[in-house]
From Swiss-Prot:
This is 4-hydroxy-tetrahydrodipicolinate reductase. Pfam families: DapB_C (PF05173), DapB_N (PF01113). It catalyses: (S)-2,3,4,5-tetrahydrodipicolinate + NAD(+) + H2O = (2S,4S)-4-hydroxy-2,3,4,5-tetrahydrodipicolinate + NADH + H(+); (S)-2,3,4,5-tetrahydrodipicolinate + NADP(+) + H2O = (2S,4S)-4-hydroxy-2,3,4,5-tetrahydrodipicolinate + NADPH + H(+). NAD(+) binds at G8, A9, K10, G11, R12, M13, D34, G76, T77, T78, A108, P109, N110, F111. One of its GO terms (molecular function) is NADP binding. Gene3D superfamilies: Dihydrodipicolinate Reductase, domain 2 (3.30.360.10), NAD(P)-binding Rossmann-like Domain (3.40.50.720). Its main location: cytoplasm. Its EC number is 1.17.1.8. GO terms for biological process: diaminopimelate biosynthetic process; lysine biosynthetic process via diaminopimelate.
Amino acid sequence: MIRVSVVGAKGRMGSHVVEAVRAADDTELALALDAGDDLTQITPQNTDVVVEFTVPAVSLNNVLTLVRQGVNVVVGTTGWTDEKLDQVRAALAETETIDGRKQSVFIAPNFAISAVLADVFARIAAPYFESAEVIELHHPDKVDAPSGTAIHTAHAIADARKAAGLGEMPDNTQTDDGSRGAVIDGVHVHAVRLRGLNAHEEVLLGNAGEQLVIRADSFDRISFMPGVLLAVRKVDSGEFPGLTVGLDQFLDL
């Protein structure tokens, strides 16, 4: 059995993770911690993998603490920048092995299989279209915008276009006033916050006379749980030492 501790266990996502860990045949709940709890309770003696779902303001410090504690970590909190990822890599470089295996941290912009596949499809399609934009739609309680998933998708589109030798996208906008959204690596990203939504993303790709729309919808947070459990199993396997970003790294694509 994989011993799993959950940090952020009382949150919207964390509570679902607790239930999923208890329900799975190959995982058991070790500790369920939330804001104010001491993370040094988590050690290799009681935990194989920690799942961290908190908020961007504290997630980096949580992960660095857990790395120092010597445990493997699966992170679902968004708001990760290249600078923060570099801090995690540096912390991992200073750690010792766990039972002869190098410590692992996994960070996912999204755990929904549909969203991960949509990102992959967008990367494949991007070189074949002149224009591409991303729209992400979430509930109004989400604290970050644009979403980590949308940022990840925008970078994937930009990388695919650069690899194909494409230049800038056509855009003759003269006045903006913020209506064109954020620009991530040259890709416009628009964020919608609306009561009744959960987590949704559209990628719009256009050529003269045609359009391709790639859309992923997560209507319930339960849709993230298969991805979370997959990440827990992969991290525990020891096959992915160091830092891994993106659930697509664990899929046979």
